[in-house]
Each structure stands twice: as structure tokens, then as C-alpha cells.
């Protein structure tokens, strides 16, 4: 039986709709000590700088336009089989990192390596081959609202493989069972809750058994029970499949509970700290403490930079 895999990129289908079923992920190794600076000084090379590194961000600079730099000279490595959370304020480049790993954007300077190969947006054949090994859970699910739960999960299997319908059926039901929704297979997307929709999107993201799963804000907009379910699924799927998981989130407690390694970013991708969850939670560094404890003022100021009160209100001192 042929299982020929088609290039994995922008999938076309489902009544003319387009879906990006790309996926990525990468975690960090467990370290006993918190690091205040980037953990690796990566230089261009044919192989990853660490024997177990699956993804390497190598002195990457990127901006969506010339007027604003999102990431500036960022270097990171992600090891196989771990859950790594990337935390930080809005606009610090967390989601942009995922897009660079998946080849959605190309770095202005530096490079991204996946399993030793440069992620080159110009080399479509190689990029599709790399993306075939990645899975992505989007923040808003990107589900087809006019299809059933079953057909949403089956979509990448139909688009990217030549599997028989009976095999597709079995795979879809197994993936839905893994996220606790096998019984919801025939429901329409309009009939499911937000938390269920997130789990359906996860089942679709793992339909092709990716080596890397990238989660973009997987806890956003979920109630406490759904949030706990999502966190448990991320950790369990990682442990059962041996995948590498990369979680971008603002939710500190959930990420600390499921991660092997945590990276805290600031403006332009500056690495504030990285280490085990315990190391960051017990850090005495003021910037780290402010973020993990949610303190309103500290190194990250409450007030946006402005002229003095005397200047704005015409008060003479």
C-alpha cells in the first residue's frame, strides 16, 4: 500500500478554503542552574551545536519591516523529547520564533536549523520535507466550521497521504480518543465548546505523527478545567510519543507545571533567563521575579516613558 507523503505546507481543499497545517516544536534540556544569558554561543556549522539539539536558532535577527526589529541576535537550542515553554510579554517575539522555525518567515540575519539542516524558505522541497515532521496548534484552532470534527482531523491525512479510507478512519478515531473526543467525531464544529475545539485542533496537529509539536497560546481563553485538560494533554502526548514540544504562552502556572525547561524573553527576543521551572520560580533576579509573580511594577515599568509631570502640566519646580 502506498503511503506517499505529499509536500506539507499550505493545504488546499474543504470547499475552497485554505489551511496551514504546519507544525513545529522544540524543548530545552533539563538544567540544574538558571542561566541569565543565552545558553549557547551558536556559530554556523553543519551539525547542531549540542549532540541532542533538534532545533538551533543561530544569531537570528528578524523584523516584519525595516522600522521595527522583533528579534535581535537571538541564539537558542532546543533538545529532543522535552517540553520547553517560551514565556515573555506581548510583542517580545515568542510567536515569531515559531514562524521562523516553520519557515513561514526567513531570518534577516543568522539562520534556523532543524535536525542539522538550515530552514531555507527558498528551498521548497526541503522545507516541505521538514514541515512534514512538524505539527502546529494555532492559537485560534483554524478549524473548518463547515466540516465535522472527524473531517477536520482527517483533513491533513487526506491532503498529505495516500492512505485508504479505512486507515484514515482508524487513525482519526485514535487521535480523537487520545484527546478524549472520540465520541464527538460526528459533531459539527459549531456544536463544540472552545475547550473542545482546542483539543480537536490538537488531534489534527498530531494526525501525521510529527516529531515536533509547536503550541501557540494553547491556554488562551480556556476555563480552568479546560486549561488543566490542555496542559495534561501536552505533557502526556510528549511523554507517550517522545515528541519535542514547544509551548508559547503567557500562562505561567500551567507552563511551570508541565515544562522541562523554561525560557523567559524580553524585548527583541532578549533572553532574560532560562532554566528549570523550579530555578525560575525561586530566582532572586528582580526581572524574573516580577514576571513569574505578576508584579505590576519593577524592572518592567508600569508607566510608559514620558516627559516629567512638571513639563506636561506646566508646573514650575
Residue ranges and their predicted role:
Residues 118, 165-184:
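Conserved ABC ATPase "signature" region
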Residues 188-192, 196:
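Conserved ABC ATPase signature
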Residues 102:
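Helix-to-loop junction immediately C-terminal to a conserved catalytic motif
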Residues 110-118:
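Conserved ABC transporter NBD signature motif
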Residues 213-216:
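Catalytic Walker B motif of ABC-type/P-loop ATPase nucleotide-binding domains
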Residues 119-135, 165, 280-283:
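ABC ATPase NBD coupling module
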Residues 209:
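Conserved catalytic motifs of ABC-family nucleotide-binding domains
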